[in-house]
Amino acid sequence: MPGLFIHNGKFHQEHDAVISPDNRSFRYGDGVFETIRFHKHQMPLWNYHQQRLFGALDYLKFNVPKLLTADYLHNLILALIKKNDLTNARVRITMYRGEGGLTDKNPLQPGFVIQTWPIAKEALSLNVNGLRLGIFREGRKAIDHYSHLKTNNFLVYIQAALEAREQKWNDALVLNSENRIADSAIANIYWVKDNQIFTPPLSEAPIQGVMRRFLLEQLPIHEHPLTIEALEQADEVFLTNAVRGIQWVAFVGDTPYPTQITAATLYKDHIAPLFS
């Protein structure tokens, strides 16, 4: 049976056409999104997700209706999960500014879509085999006031993910406009050197990941720019995101990272308890 999704508070069948050709997210990528892990009737990092979502809407000057609140979205997600009969799921909220052109003077009414997909419980476990990554070199992510947002215009990340698929990498690292590493196509990056954990600061253009925020609040992680040379000299490398938790990296290009001690410890002590 096809799954259901929600558009502006109403349930629809999976293949229902509800988005106008004038939708500004379709035309210009004018919107933001959240990807959330649902596990055993809860979303453990929901507060971080809703803060990031509504913070982005405010930052991008969306005209958000008073009824469109975090509690309203939370209840819709739970209702959709129930209707789709899911226990473990990936949830996506997509917000768009409305319909119209770039120069329209009429007020724009934001809209939203909520989707869910089943996900295996094992997907949150620490990976047995280390990831093999490459560096996407055909594009750069700008360092600006918007670079930390999860916007719907994800061109550099799209191309990086395509490169990873073509090269048979598990993921691709994205460079910023200073030729330093910002993050990966789908995750934040960390490296370990001399028993200290580092991650690029938001001023280096990574996405402001919720798992990143969680770990930064739990642990003495140093925020520091990451050059390709520093990455090659790291003792350990790992990635995090809200859906997969933490994954250790075995190779970036031809550079090996044979240890997963830090990633395994973080998984055991901090990430696994979130979803127990």
Q: Which ranges hold each PLM region?
A:
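Helix-start/capping segments and mature chain N-termini
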Residues: 1-79, 101-276
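Ordered, amphipathic secondary-structure segments that act as subunit-interaction surfaces
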Residues: 77, 83-95
